[in-house]
């Protein structure tokens, strides 16, 4: 995850130690990267692991449905850092945990960030295949 962050900042021209630029880029999360739609997702704090897995699949379904309609998304973990403020501002119940934000809109394919490609671990490194 750290490598992805530094790769992203490199694309944006932000070097290590450039605190002001790093903070400015991080703050863009809280404007949903200028997307026209921003969503905050929450989950009841008593729900356990299986529910979190279901929630992840639910979020992925939104991402896939958006793409099928010509839209793009950006899932944003940064929102969970400020869960107390978000809960108060949105009037959310104390039992809800802020999971993430999701920006939704049309991608700017000329933006450097949208040219980023992350390294992927080959499936054989984390999966075991067996013959039936």
Describe the residue ranges of each PLM region.
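Acidic, surface-exposed loops and disordered segments
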Residues: 1-132
